[in-house]
């Protein structure tokens, strides 16, 4: 066990968890980024609720939200780190894992500050429905991100995180990767958004996305995809300005993404002049596997509450928001 406050030791152990040959594209990095983003993206500026404090996904009210489907894998991958460093809160661990993954996968260094505490019950868990719905367009994106205090430039910068990972039809309802190398942070998302011919496609679950089928692809190759919210970045004039800039200038994108993601990680956090968090209970809550699953990233037991077996018999898992 490390000494309390030894975040470098925690970082090293997070990096040791990144390589996962049997999971997705061989890396837990993208799901760590999504876990960090979803843990903070519930913030509401007007009511000052939600945000990265609390680790509310330990409770069914937040962890069982369809928008967070699949994130139990990220939480489970990080359990060995928590067991080795029990002094770190889940809220700090999940956000730190996101910024560590971004840098380890070739992205920019994101400023991260500790001090978050974990909720001791679910009384302060934010309501569901605050995360973006990827089936929507520009107006929806602005409604969600303006609520958190972001502007158009920051919205587009954060969307560049789609250069990592892929969608799963049993989680978000969409299917496929955005880019050819989904475990390497780059500005490729913006380049492909602008240059490829994206065609609408309706998936078996009735949800529509956009795909590019490479005429030179080999049999079995998975087509790249874009979400309706991604296409909105290209078609909305104000968003498009930043898409063009980031496609042309990787360094600018990295700089803006790092600043926007650091801001995201601080949503709902208030600090004093010494950077100590002053709006938390300073009590560390215990681990609760929510939805009610094991600590292993193998999925729920058959019929487990919060899992997908029942939904699958009724036409598939409920569509989650991204």
Curated annotation (Swiss-Prot):
One of its GO terms (molecular function) is metal ion binding. Belongs to the peroxidase family. Cytochrome c peroxidase subfamily. Residues 288-322 are annotated as: Disordered. Its EC number is 1.11.1.-. The keyword Cell membrane does not apply. The lineage of its organism: Eukaryota, Fungi, Dikarya, Ascomycota, Pezizomycotina. Keywords: Heme, Iron, Metal-binding, Oxidoreductase, Peroxidase. Transmembrane segments: none annotated. Binds 1 heme b (iron(II)-protoporphyrin IX) group per subunit. Its cofactor is heme b. Heme b binds at residue 162. It comes from Aspergillus fumigatus (strain ATCC MYA-4609 / CBS 101355 / FGSC A1100 / Af293). One of its GO terms (biological process) is cellular response to oxidative stress. This is Putative heme-binding peroxidase. PANTHER family: L-ASCORBATE PEROXIDASE 3, THYLAKOID LUMENAL 29 KDA PROTEIN, CHLOROPLASTIC-RELATED. InterPro entries: Ccp1-like, Haem_peroxidase, Haem_peroxidase_sf, Peroxidase_I, Peroxidases_AS, Peroxidases_heam-ligand_BS. The active site is at residues 38, 178. Gene3D superfamilies: 1.10.520.10, Peroxidase, domain 2 (1.10.420.10). Destroys radicals which are normally produced within the cells and which are toxic to biological systems.
């Amino acid at each position: 066990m490390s000494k309390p406050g030894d975040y470098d030791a925690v970082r090293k152990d997070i990096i040791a968890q990144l390589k996962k040959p049997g999971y997705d594209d061989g890396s837990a990095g993208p799901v760590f980024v999504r876990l960090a983003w979803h843990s903070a993206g519930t913030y509401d500026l007007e009511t000052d609720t939600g945000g990265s404090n609390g680790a509310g996904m330990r409770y069914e009210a937040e962890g069982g939200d369809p928008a967070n489907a699949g994130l139990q894998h990220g939480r489970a991958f990080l359990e060995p780190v928590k067991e080795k460093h029990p002094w770190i809160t889940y809220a700090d661990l999940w956000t730190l894992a996101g910024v560590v993954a971004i840098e380890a996968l070739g992205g920019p260094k994101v400023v991260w500050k500790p001090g978050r505490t974990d909720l001791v019950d679910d009384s302060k868990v934010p309501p569901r429905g605050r995360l973006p719905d990827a089936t929507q367009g520009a107006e929806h994106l602005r409604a969600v991100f303006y609520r958190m205090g972001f502007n158009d430039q920051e919205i587009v910068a954060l969307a560049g995180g789609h250069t990592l990972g892929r969608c799963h039809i049993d989680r978000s309802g969409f299917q496929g990767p955005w880019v050819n190398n989904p475990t390497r942070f780059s500005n490729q998302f913006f380049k492909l958004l602008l240059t490829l011919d994206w065609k609408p496609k309706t998936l078996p679950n009735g949800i529509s996305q956009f795909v590019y089928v490479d005429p030179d692809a080999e049999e079995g190759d998975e087509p790249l995809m874009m979400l309706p919210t991604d296409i909105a970045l290209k078609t909305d004039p104000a968003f498009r300005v930043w898409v063009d800039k980031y496609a042309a200038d990787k360094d600018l994108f990295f700089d803006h993404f790092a600043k926007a993601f650091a801001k995201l990680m601080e949503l709902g956090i208030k600090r004093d002049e010494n950077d100590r968090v002053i709006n938390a209970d300073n009590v560390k809550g215990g681990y609760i596997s929510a939805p009610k699953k094991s600590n292993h990233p193998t999925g729920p037991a058959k019929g487990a509450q919060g899992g997908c077996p029942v939904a699958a018999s009724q036409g598939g898992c409920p569509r989650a928001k991204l």
